[in-house]
């Protein structure tokens, strides 16, 4: 007969493996739309470890419902998303790229922007929410915003606390056609 200690330890390992796996379904976008319209904007939302970025998928879905094509994925998928964005931009189907990320997704957002910069592609907006580690925002990013937890917020509630701000930035930047600074 298995002891409760062994069962508990096994359960913890299963839960940890589930959360660490980027492809268990929660990171797949319900808001991912067909390819961006001719010369349009696209928002990439990068979730943190185990896709445990409460409210960020819903934020991405709400932006998609407002007509901005949105892709919601786990932070580990940023290299493939960068390649997709490069192809879309170079083909003329994408004019404006915006990236939002939380925790490890915030760090990945900066990495993705840097990869786009190496391809000579501007990024309209990068929003990070309590990113892990300090990253230098690359020069191809027109505007960057970093939200950190403050009075009463924690690593997860920072998303809910700044949803309106994020919406304003994303919706405002999707209409902007200004040069990259």
Please describe what each predicted stretch is.
Residues 109-117:
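Short glycine-enriched nucleophile-adjacent loop
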């Amino acid at each position: 007969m298995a002891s409760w200690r062994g069962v508990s330890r096994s359960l913890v390992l299963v839960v940890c493996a589930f959360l660490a796996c980027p492809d268990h379904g929660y990171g797949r976008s319900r808001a991912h739309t067909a390819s961006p319209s001719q010369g349009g904007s696209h928002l990439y939302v990068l979730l943190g470890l185990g896709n445990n970025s409460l409210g960020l998928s819903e934020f991405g879905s709400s932006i998609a419902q407002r007509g901005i094509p949105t892709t919601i994925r786990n932070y580990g998928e940023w290299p493939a998303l960068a390649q997709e964005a490069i192809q879309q931009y170079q083909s003329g189907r994408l004019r404006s790229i915006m990236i939002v990320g939380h925790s490890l997704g915030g760090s990945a957002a900066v990495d993705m922007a840097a990869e786009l910069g190496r391809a000579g592609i501007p990024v309209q907006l990068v929003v990070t929410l309590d990113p892990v580690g300090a990253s230098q925002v690359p020069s191809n990013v027109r505007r960057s915003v970093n939200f950190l937890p403050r009075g009463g917020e924690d690593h997860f509630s920072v998303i809910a606390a700044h949803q309106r701000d994020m919406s304003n930035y994303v919706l405002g930047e999707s209409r902007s056609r200004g040069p990259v600074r």
